[in-house]
Amino acid sequence: MSTTPERSGGVDTILLVRLAAASVLLAVSLVLELSELLRTVLLAAAVVAAGYDIALEAVRSVQRKDFFAAPVVVLFVTAAALISGFFAETAAMVVLYQLGSAIVAYSQERLCQSALSNIGKSRTEIYEHISAMIGDREGARTAISSALESAAGAVLRFGIVIAVLFAVLVPLMTGLTYRVSIHRALVMILVCNTGSVVASLSCVTLTGMCSCAGKGIVTERAEALEALADTEVAVFDKSGVFTDSSPEVVAVEPVRLDRDTFITFAAHAAYYSEQSFAQAVADLYGKDYKLELIGDFVDIAGAGVELSIGGAHVVFGKRILFAGREEELPPDSAGTGQVYYMTVAGKYVGRLSVSSGMNPASENLVRDFRDEGVEKLVLLTEEGREESTVFAEEMRFTGLFSQCDTAAKLKCIRDMRSATSGNVVYIYANGVQMHTDADVDIRVSGRSKYADILVLPEYVDELPSALETAKRIKSISAINALITFAVKAVVITLALTGYCNLWLAVLLDSAAAVAAVFNSDKVSAESHARVYKRKK
């Protein structure tokens, strides 16, 4: 059966002592020749010793208006069975129910600790984040877990109706006594309890989250990881995902201006820009800005910026930005990096180079997404059409949007979301200061603000494995539910034919719950998942 939310996953010594005492009382009542009154007293004492906390939990559930919670169902069955005279069987049922709940809780705890070991305590923030989610059942909730819980609840309600009809009508149509029909009905109600179905659901999700976290992929909410399983469109922002996430200025070549003045002009020119080179220039400058000098700012995605600084017209950008203008630029140098030229009042004043190295970890990213069944792979970039097309063809993207500023990127994502029935995933590194219209926002960065999933830059090649994990979360959750529902069906069949009693129903249902919990570990089993190897 299910562990209750209030119970700790560790070994409860007091509970074990109570169960031992209840077992002794049960054994004494069955083995020794006692009067009926004394036997009844001993069995009642065994029930109270083993399960008084079930009554307390049932009261709390009723106060929360959760009338079909496991403690409420068990308390009802216990009371009805005692009233019907099944004292020894009821005592055995309560002992086994409590023991089964303790074993399930302990199994959940051990599985979660094993999953956490995949992260390693050296990653303190990630470890603490996932540890907190283990104690937060809502944080581990997914669409499939909610659906299965709802289905289990419906089965319980339907089972109660059928059990009541069976108890009332069958004696009228057959030779069964009401005592026998009530007994079989109680077994049906007990086994329809939702506990064993939901016991493994959070374990499956948390195991998957820990597996991903061990690969540098941290989820802010479990539903985001689950949503990856239904990815139809993957949208990639080139900057920071495929290119260097932290570009640097590698060369400064001023003309007419001294170096400090040139850098000051460049920093002010790039201050309001959302393009990746702007941060590199800001890092080089490192001084106070005089923003009142900046006017008429225009951010030209993929090319550069145009503005006025102190009333002087300034153009700062790639060579393509100066096409058709009167300013004459020197020929490209043989140095490395992307070159940005600057003119002030129509005069060329120098250039600087920004590193533009590729992120080796993303070399096979598009291919691996395609291997996971994602056919629509779209590239968003600030760069010009010609340069972007070459890169998109090399990486085999199926769609391209070039010269996109942040607003254009957000519009592209919004349009794709409205035109797609499946899920849209947006993978970016910087420049977006809000949640987009994508179903899942994945940020390649050390900071997770506005992202559903955070990927550490050096682990971006592991991202496709998160899709594999998401699919396994869904499939294993379904398998676990199938296991427990199948056991319930067998027990109900046995109950209807008179071959199952209360304690046997609890024993079989608890065994199914434990099996489902241990099966959850398959989410992270390397033998069942495609392995993505990082290029060193």
Model-derived regions: residue spans:
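Flexible metal-binding regulatory segments at protein termini and peripheral loops
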Residues: 1-38, 114, 124-140, 528-536
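Conserved cytosolic catalytic loops of P-type ATPases
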Residues: 1-4, 116-132, 158, 222-266, ...
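Hydrophobic alpha-helical transmembrane segments
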Residues: 43-85, 89-119, 126, 140-238, ...
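Conserved ATP-binding TGD loop and adjacent catalytic N/P-domain core of P-type ATPases
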Residues: 117, 124, 129-132, 136-140, ...
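Active-site-proximal glycine-rich helix-loop-beta segment
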Residues: 193-195, 232, 238-239, 244-245, ...
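P-type ATPase nucleotide-binding
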Residues: 249, 253-375, 385, 397-415, ...
